[in-house]
């Protein structure tokens, strides 16, 4: 249940922040938070990361539905006693559903977190994207830990 609560929290935060951006900012408008480093910028994306597969909504609906079903299956089957795995999957589930809602309702994803890292203008993203990335990183860490345990047992 905890892992679904994590997903729900991510979905709520993601949708609330996107709603605030859509209601209070013009498309393309940028608000500096830390000048030359961090901005809130109203942006839309009809594709995936870096705009790849722009406009291929049917593809995103199909893939995201399969991913959501897979994550729920893994949560139900493999997270007992595996807290890190459960948190990773909860974050991934929340992120996947957050962007799925945008695609289903708006036919585009609302992005707004704009970061510049040492003169590199990083692609604008949102809370769902961040949640997916952190979830994948935690999943990778879990896999490394599991691999280390198996080697120790041999």
Swiss-Prot record:
Its main location: membrane. It is found in: Cell membrane. Pathway: Protein modification; lipoprotein biosynthesis (signal peptide cleavage). One of its GO terms (cellular component) is plasma membrane. One of its GO terms (molecular function) is aspartic-type endopeptidase activity. The active site is at 111, 129. GO terms for biological process: proteolysis. Its EC number is 3.4.23.36. Keywords: Aspartyl protease, Cell membrane, Hydrolase, Membrane, Protease, Transmembrane, Transmembrane helix. It comes from the Bacteria. It catalyses: Release of signal peptides from bacterial membrane prolipoproteins. Hydrolyzes -Xaa-Yaa-Zaa-|-(S,diacylglyceryl)Cys-, in which Xaa is hydrophobic (preferably Leu), and Yaa (Ala or Ser) and Zaa (Gly or Ala) have small, neutral side chains. It is a multi-pass membrane protein. Pfam families: Peptidase_A8. The chain crosses the membrane at residues 52-72, 85-105, 124-144. This protein specifically catalyzes the removal of signal peptides from prolipoproteins. Belongs to the peptidase A8 family. HAMAP family: LspA. This is Lipoprotein signal peptidase. It comes from Bacillus subtilis (strain 168).
